[in-house]
Amino acid sequence: MVENFSEWFHDILEEANITDSRYPIKGMAVWMPYGFQIRKYTTNLIKEVYDRDHEEVLFPLLVPEAELAKEGLHVKGFEDEVYWVTHGGKTQLNEKLALRPTSETSIYPMYSLWIRSHIDLPLKYYQIVNTFRYETKHTRPLIRVREITTFKEAHTAHASKEEADIQVQEHIENYKEIFDTLGIPYTLTKRPEWDKFPGADYTMAFDAIMPDGKTLQIGTIHNLGQTFAKTFDITFEDKDGEHKLVYQTCAGLSDRVIASAIGIHGDEKGLRLPPEISPKQITIIPILFKKGKEEVLAKCEELKKEFEAAGLRVNIDNRDIRPGKKFYDWELKGTPIKLELGPRDLENNKTIAMRRDQLEKIELDLDENLVSNVIRLIDELNENLAESAKEFHTDHIKFASDIDEVRKLIEEGNVVAVNWCGDTDCGEKIEEITGYSVLGIYEELEEAGKKCILSDEDAKYVALIAKTY
């Protein structure tokens, strides 16, 4: 973990060639080549999980104002953040068009055309697109932006409430798989009524604890009930010939998944990337002298082919610069495994390996076991990154029994668990008094007799309170 996280995060995005924030619109950044590769492998992981029981689609970017305005609660939640297109060339449009802030109001009019019968259900589509929100707070690349460039949204329709509830649990399991693969620990809460997705019956949310103690919302899942089905007339004919409204869910992930993987695993030397999303999982660094140069380079190429045959992503850094600069660069960029090979190593049939999480030299034989030994090192690194992150996460959730303790613990960089009655007025009062956010319900209290931290009423839940991004 890094100490001055805000400064570190800003610097590492630039130094590691992830994004460039100098684009002349606030809150919009350029994905640079190395960052774009990280993004590509992250979206590949998301697609691998969602392609199992969803189909990928792609909807237009523009949403007619009339469609956006149909669902009152929904548009109220986004109306201050919408970008509007008012002209086509020099001609003023008859109807304003919104750059999608999210896609419910563009997707669901089409669902009303596509769903006719119970045999059309369940309908499960997802897309990975860019969305736009006029963010007025302090923007931060990948965390708080005006253009979300990697927005995965899944939208499902079902014949019954029970099926929609089951789908919410399936979304939760999908997200757990994605976050677990990346070694990102999380809290899962049911968002309070005042903070749920506009138009939803309820919202479940995943939050990661960043190195500065703030929480970052990294995934949300919404049970929409029949709210949007009523608005957009999404009905089906059941087996008995009766027309009924569908039940719906939606679920979203964004660039924040990448931000959390970068932030949670990084250290003072730079990135420590989970192997799943590292552009290169192995970097081979030839140590070259005039004598034996060709033999070393030939062996590096041979090793590269062997690793690639095993499904690994490999590069050879044969730039004409000092080895020390190469070591520095790949530590900064977080490549999981670095292999050094020089004439003496080749003579001794050895190579020097180094795991990015430990930075200790490991001597390996250049034999038939090399590939399996390196794969073992990658697996050990992956496991260690996850365990270290989990330990930090667990250590930074503390219980408080009074409001003063809540403030103190959060200022010390923790997320705080409290007993809560569940009343909306009480929850909003907690936020007002502390200046921090009630993330939501962490778990239900099974034993009676415990009192709410504020109202002194019987507590029903354990809630989490945090400083948030």
Swiss-Prot record:
GO cellular component, one term: cytoplasm
InterPro entries noted in UniProt: aa-tRNA-synt_IIb, aa-tRNA-synth_II, aa-tRNA-synth_II/BPL/LPL, Anticodon-bd, Anticodon-bd_dom_sf, Pro-tRNA-ligase_IIa, Pro-tRNA-ligase_IIa_arc-type, Pro-tRNA_ligase_II_C
Subcellular location: Cytoplasm
One Pfam family in the UniProt entry: ProRS-C_1
Keyword Ligase: yes
GO molecular function: ATP binding; proline-tRNA ligase activity
E.C. designation(s): 6.1.1.15
Record remark on domains: Consists of three domains: the N-terminal catalytic domain, the anticodon-binding domain and the C-terminal extension.
Stated role: Catalyzes the attachment of proline to tRNA(Pro) in a two-step reaction: proline is first activated by ATP to form Pro-AMP and then transferred to the acceptor end of tRNA(Pro).
Similarity annotation: Belongs to the class-II aminoacyl-tRNA synthetase family. ProS type 3 subfamily.
Protein name: Proline--tRNA ligase
Organism of provenance: Methanobrevibacter smithii (strain ATCC 35061 / DSM 861 / OCM 144 / PS)
